[in-house]
Amino acid sequence: SRGLGDVYKRQDFIMFCFQCQETAGNKGCTKVGVCGKNENTANSQDLLIYVTKGLSEVVNKIGEVDSKYYDLISNNMFVTITNANFDEEDILRKVEETIKAKDKLIKENKLEDLSDAAKYTSDDRNELKRKAIEVGVLNIINEDERSLVELVTYGLKGMAAYNHHANVLGYRNEEVDKFIAQTLEKTLKDDKDINDLINLTMETGKHGLMAMELLDKANTEKFGNPEITEVDFSAGDNPAILISGHDLNDMEMLLEQSKDSGVDIYTHSEMLPANYYPKFKKYDLSLIHISEPTRHWAI
């Protein structure tokens, strides 16, 4: 591993992201994301993942911690998925929150012999932005190792998103919580073995399924079993709100708050299944699905 400053300078990169299928040239976005993410946001997300790995190491060393730390880990990973949060200021606040949480645990438990990700601390924005450039994807030089680490990381991001949605509905799987933290720490190892990373990828898939099962249980027990449903794809004349994503808890709150207001609710993309849940059908305000709006908006 080495810092990315020289790599960026030599290759004329100001960022590097290749986590989605739309990435530039099917290789990676190096100046601005195809999604619209700029280099400051991309680098801040890299730093958030880095300090979250550090927090994970600390949590693992302690063994038993308050569930709020696992929630913070999952939420941080969720923040970095494509189109979830492009607010650099908000991401840097989460970096600072994570550093404070990590430092508090280290001090209270007198932890030693930690990695740089666990020890790293700063409340200076300029220093945080400098560090962000050092800890990105390309910091792993070996391409096979890098690819497997990132494959695992992206699996953890999806797992964390489903885990977060289940958590807000009051459902939790401690094995999933601990797997996310333990696996994030494993990606920090300098002496990574390719076969171990392949096995870790398979374990990530297994636990990803567990997270999906947890979210399915949460959604069906709270909103009912999905039913075959005819969905309207037309648009009306009323003011409207467009909602995407997977958070049915947000959908319920939105439907309740907009009830009898004359405001229509349009689902988009991943939120299409909201139309199938029995509990949402009690609202007079019908859900309408928009297949391809010009932009994604998430509540």
Regions found by a protein language model. Give the residues of each.
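Extended, well-ordered protein cores
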Residues: 190, 197-214, 230-232, 264, ...
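Single conserved hydrophobic/aromatic residue that forms the stacking wall/gate
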Residues: 1-8, 288-299
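Cys/His-coordinated zinc-binding microdomains
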Residues: 21
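Extended, regular secondary-structure scaffolds
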Residues: 236-287, 291, 295
